[in-house]
């Protein structure tokens, strides 16, 4: 490349992946990322929180998608003058890490961990969580994402963990952390509870499962005086037969009507509304012996199905439950308080303590001797058999099994090990979320959400129903809960620590590692024990890993022990992004802790994108291989192609996205190649490097510069509101106008080395690459550096509003010209009339034909028509067809919507000057109806976009037009021949043409037209024995003159 010439580019299609690798190598050598940060020193800061991923697995499409957004927004904000730090983080604790190590070591049980030693196990976890950091860095770098790996944070670091225990201590001091006994989702494989929000994070947490469902009669003993229930059976239905040995009560709704019916020699009680559901067992028209309101049944005593806990205080009575319905079952609900959240609440209110015969591994213990050692799911079959035969433990109290069926239903599974969960009462530590739930709802209103509906929808509704958060886990690899208790209940004491200083003060040693087992070794005498025999010991639990990540804003900088001023200036964050499931995960825990600790939101703006699916529409699966390999896509199409495919899709507006190879390649075809080809076109035809100019008077130059000004404004508007798909669409539309209109219509000017055209295109590409830089950072870097020879497009500012001349009228007119040409071209194609065949006439009917008057010749030339007629008589060639949008209008209009539809169909709808529609008794707003322009003659007429008008194409072909079309076909063939023989576009040539006799008149008539277009200074007709065949029997020879 000389100082005054563009780089010489290789011919043919560009190798985009290879070019991208060159850029990445340049960035690495140049340290461009750090330069982009440094040049904003002293500028206002834009605070981006990068949610930490787990590093014990390789990145997938979901990570790539989020990562692209995490790159685009900081790049854009940096160009807008902000300093944007991009510190990477690693989520390192929790069961994902533990399970990976268990797989590596062949561990299947917690007892094996205890046997090998917690220290050894946690050392293995530490090594595992950082196993893939190099691979992660390679992926992140390859996707052209700029992040600071050198200054990363890890949740396992001592400083990070100290901030986390500080947060717990703050909650304790505020009365917002407590220990309680609750029914929680419980993983028997991992032997630990889960929090409720973990069950709602991913769609596949609830999986279809078949369970035995039984309807069992519990025999009433005593009943109420004179109600006739003594000896009848209360019918209950359950899909968890394994909980029947723990039954302590049944619940009814006080307001539901119940009946006692005779069926054979037995009497059964159930909700009247459920009789039909049990017609097979009870008869089509059973004899009703009595009718009762649920309230009348309260206190009724019965015999439980199994007699293991017959002496349990206050048990085995009918209680009131507001959760009881008649949607399924019998209207009477079996309650085992240790295994049902509602059951526990109702039972506690009347003094029924739970029984817990199931151990931490999900197996029955000795208190249920007949099933001892069996896993609860395995015991279901034997329990059903015993009920069916009234044998074994079911023989004592005589329960009656009247139905046994298989019930398929969505059932929660552990999101980590994928085993089905149970609900089990456990002791756990909680954050008292219900105390500040209303405040969380209020603070959510200060957050800007994209999509907007997430605020009051998925996230807002979740906040409204938020329950206390179970934050303790009975595991090993995690931040310890900093609670020490006396080991003697006679001298109770609880100490909570929130810093290393506090631990050192009381234990005389400053921990160098807060992980187990080292933290567990810190003990001291109980200060409240005068005997001096009891000891303060740490509880064995660790914190929920979501507590770790939710602490990220302050823990990453070791707040409040360091960086107090920094934190105050960087909290809340300006922006975060993750997938929609994090409304139950990271978004949620950030919000909980921010509200509890600081009474502020943790973030100002959040993008919650949809889910990336495999090409079969299912969740991506390695075993199914239902998605393109990421590395192969990078190697074949490049990162910018992947970025464009993901960012231009509806997924950032909350929809899901199916990944296909064709979809990725479409981005190359629609945007990347057109941008590259435009740059290549300029480099090929410009005799020297263009200069910045915006003063050309040529209408096409003025148009593309004004169109670029519109792009600048549109992109700015979209990026300011994080509408990245909208920004991509604006760029795609501009690229279409640039390549398929401006460059194509200006080719002859470039061939003539027109300085206005060259300078204008140079200027347009220079600005376009800056505007596109956040969206397509690699290809824009190549083009920018080739255009300007400057260091990097990513070290430039966002184009200013007054940088380019604007001309709204010209843009509107030329855009309509393009629409006219597009519609007419579609008609020509439908009629199968080739492009080079001239046609006699095009009629353009628009509201303001004067707008198009200056462009009549351009339209005629573009469409190859002899005459263009402009008119405002739209109704001559078509009509507007009105339809009512019933889905929108219906809720407001009610029954009047049908009258409106009828009026519109009858042609009685009238559009008012204000845009409303009068239709029968109703007045519809513009969004409640649709207006579509319909052509009177669809074969020759087409509507313009948005009902702007119509075009009518006369497809009559005369002999004269056919002859001219024949000549233009030959011109195209001769141009291709020039190109294939290596002639320069400006070379003059000599042509000898041999034409069949039947075409000789056509050839001679249009000799000058042909010669002029192909730059032939000498053109003659003669018979050729050899020469090159170019079509329709024509042979030619050409040579440079």
From Swiss-Prot:
Its EC number is 6.1.1.5. Its cofactor is Zn(2+). Keywords: Aminoacyl-tRNA synthetase, Antibiotic resistance, ATP-binding, Cytoplasm, Ligase, Metal-binding, Nucleotide-binding, Protein biosynthesis, Zinc. One of its GO terms (biological process) is isoleucyl-tRNA aminoacylation. GO terms for cellular component: cytoplasm; peptidoglycan-based cell wall; plasma membrane. It is an enzyme of class 6 (ligase). It catalyses: tRNA(Ile) + L-isoleucine + ATP = L-isoleucyl-tRNA(Ile) + AMP + diphosphate. GO terms for molecular function: aminoacyl-tRNA deacylase activity; ATP binding; isoleucine-tRNA ligase activity; tRNA binding; zinc ion binding. The keyword 4Fe-4S does not apply. Belongs to the class-I aminoacyl-tRNA synthetase family. IleS type 2 subfamily. Catalyzes the attachment of isoleucine to tRNA(Ile). As IleRS can inadvertently accommodate and process structurally similar amino acids such as valine, to avoid such errors it has two additional distinct tRNA(Ile)-dependent editing activities. One activity is designated as 'pretransfer' editing and involves the hydrolysis of activated Val-AMP. The other activity is designated 'posttransfer' editing and involves deacylation of mischarged Val-tRNA(Ile). Confers high-level resistance to the antibiotic mupirocin (pseudomonic acid A), an Ile-analog that competitively inhibits activation by Ile-tRNA synthetase, thus inhibiting protein biosynthesis. This is Isoleucine--tRNA ligase. The lineage of its organism: Bacteria, Bacillati, Actinomycetota, Actinomycetes, Mycobacteriales.
């Amino acid at each position: 490349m000389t100082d005054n010439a563009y780089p010489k580019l290789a011919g043919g299609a560009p190798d985009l992946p290879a070019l991208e690798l060159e850029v990445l190598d340049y960035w690495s050598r140049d340290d461009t990322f750090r330069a982009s940060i440094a040049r904003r020193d002293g500028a206002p800061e834009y605070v981006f929180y990068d949610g930490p991923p787990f590093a014990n697995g390789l990145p997938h499409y979901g990570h790539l998608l989020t990562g692209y957004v995490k790159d685009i927004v900081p790049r854009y904000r940096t160009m807008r003058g902000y300093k944007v730090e991009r510190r990477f983080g690693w989520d390192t604790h929790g069961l994902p890490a533990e399970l990976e190590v268990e797989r590596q070591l062949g561990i299947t049980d917690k007892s094996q961990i205890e046997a090998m030693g917690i220290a050894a196990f946690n050392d293995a976890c530490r090594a595992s969580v950082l196993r893939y950091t190099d691979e992660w860095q390679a992926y992140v770098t390859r996707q052209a994402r700029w992040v600071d790996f050198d200054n990363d944070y890890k949740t396992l670091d001592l400083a990070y963990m100290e901030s986390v225990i500080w947060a717990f201590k703050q909650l304790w001091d505020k009365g917002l952390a407590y220990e309680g006994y609750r029914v929680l989702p419980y993983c028997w494989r991992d032997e630990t509870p889960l929090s409720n929000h973990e069950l709602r994070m991913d769609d596949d947490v609830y999986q279809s499962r078949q369970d035995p469902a039984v309807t069992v009669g519990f025999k009433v003993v005593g009943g109420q005086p004179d109600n006739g229930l003594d000896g009848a059976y209360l019918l209950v239905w359950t899909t968890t037969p394994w909980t029947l040995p723990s039954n302590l009560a049944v619940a009814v709704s006080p307001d539901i009507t119940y009946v006692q019916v005779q069926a054979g020699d037995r009497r059964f009680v159930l909700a009247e509304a459920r009789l039909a559901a049990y017609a097979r067992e009870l008869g089509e028209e059973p004899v009703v012996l009595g009718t009762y309101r649920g309230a009348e049944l309260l206190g009724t005593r019965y015999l439980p199905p199994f007699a293991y806990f017959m002496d349990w205080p206050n048990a085995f009575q009918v209680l009131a439950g507001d959760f009881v319905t008649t949607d399924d079952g019998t209207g009477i609900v079996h309650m085992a308080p240790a295994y049902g959240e509602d059951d526990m609440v109702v039972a506690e209110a009347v003094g029924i303590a739970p029984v817990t015969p199931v151990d931490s591994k999900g197996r029955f213990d000795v208190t249920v001797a007949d099933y001892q050692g069996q896993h609860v799911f395995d015991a279901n079959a034997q329990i059903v058999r015993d009920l069916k035969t009234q044998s074994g433990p079911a023989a004592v109290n005589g329960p009656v099994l009247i139905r046994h069926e298989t019930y398929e239903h969505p059932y929660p599974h552990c999101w980590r090990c994928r085993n089905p969960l149970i609900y089990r009462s456990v002791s756990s530590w909680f954050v008292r979320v219900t105390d500040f739930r209303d405040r969380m709802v209020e603070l959510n209103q200060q957050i800007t959400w994209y999509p907007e509906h997430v605020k009051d929808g998925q996230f807002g509704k979740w906040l409204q129903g938020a329950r206390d958060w179970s934050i303790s886990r009975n595991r090993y690899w995690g931040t310890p809960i900093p609670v020490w208790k006396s080991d003697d209940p006679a001298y109770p004491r609880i100490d909570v620590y929130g810093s290393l200083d506090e631990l050192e003060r009381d234990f005389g040693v400053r921990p160098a590692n807060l992980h187990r087992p080292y933290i567990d070794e810190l003990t001291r005498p109980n200060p409240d024990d005068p005997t001096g025999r009891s000891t303060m010991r740490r509880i064995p639990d660790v914190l929920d890993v979501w507590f770790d990540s939710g602490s990220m804003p302050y823990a990453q900088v070791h707040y409040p022990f360091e960086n107090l001023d920094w934190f105050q200036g960087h909290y809340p964050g300006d922006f975060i992004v993750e997938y929609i499931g994090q409304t139950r995960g990271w978004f949620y825990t950030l919000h909980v802790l921010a509200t509890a600790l600081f009474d502020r939101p943790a973030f100002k703006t959040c993008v919650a994108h949809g889910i990336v699916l495999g090409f079969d529409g299912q969740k991506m699966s390695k075993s199914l291989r239902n998605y393109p390999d990421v590395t192969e896509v990078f190697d074949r199409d490049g990162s910018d192609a992947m970025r464009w495919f993901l960012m231009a899709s509806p997924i950032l507006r909350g929809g899901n996205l199916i990944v296909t190879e064709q979809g990725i390649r479409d981005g190359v075809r629609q945007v990347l190649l057109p941008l590259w080809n435009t740059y290549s076109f300029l480099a090929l035809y410009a005799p020297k490097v263009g200069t910045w100019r915006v003063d050309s008077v040529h209408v096409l130059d003025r148009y593309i510069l004004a169109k670029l000004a519109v792009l600048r404004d549109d992109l700015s508007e979209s990026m300011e509101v994080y509408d990245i798909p909208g920004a991509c669409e604006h760029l795609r539309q501009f690229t279409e106008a640039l390549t398929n209109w401006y460059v194509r219509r200006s080719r002859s000017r470039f061939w003539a080395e027109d300085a206005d055209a060259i300078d204008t295109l140079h200027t347009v590409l220079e600005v376009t690459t800056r505007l596109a830089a956040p969206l397509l950072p690699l290809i824009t870097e190549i083009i920018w550096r080739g255009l300007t020879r400057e260091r990097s497009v990513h070290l430039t500012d966002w184009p200013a509003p007054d940088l380019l001349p604007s001309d709204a009228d010209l843009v509107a007119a030329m855009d309509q010209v393009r629409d006219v040409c597009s519609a007419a071209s579609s008609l020509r194609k439908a009629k199968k009339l080739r492009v080079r065949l001239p046609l006699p006439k095009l009629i353009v009917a628009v509201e303001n034909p004067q707008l198009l008057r200056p462009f009549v010749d351009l339209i005629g030339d573009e469409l190859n028509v002899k005459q263009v007629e402009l008119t405002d008589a739209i109704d001559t060639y078509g009509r507007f067809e009105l339809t009512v949008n019933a889905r929108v209008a219906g809720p407001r209009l009610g029954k009047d919507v049908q009258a409106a539809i009828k009026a519109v169909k009858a042609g009685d709808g009238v559009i008012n000057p204000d845009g409303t529609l009068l239709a029968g008794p109703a007045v519809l707003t513009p969004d409640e109806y649709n207006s579509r322009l319909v052509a009177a003659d669809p074969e020759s007429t087409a509507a313009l976009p948005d009902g702007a008008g119509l075009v009518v194409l006369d497809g009559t072909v005369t002999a004269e037009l056919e002859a001219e079309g024949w000549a233009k076909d030959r011109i195209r063939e001769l141009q291709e021949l020039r190109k294939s023989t290596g002639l320069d576009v400006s070379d003059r040539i000599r042509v000898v043409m041999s034409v069949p006799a039947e075409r000789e008149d056509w050839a001679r008539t249009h000799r000058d037209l042909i010669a002029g277009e192909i730059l032939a200074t000498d053109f003659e007709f003669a018979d050729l024995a050899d020469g090159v065949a170019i079509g329709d029997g024509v042979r030619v020879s050409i040579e440079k003159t």
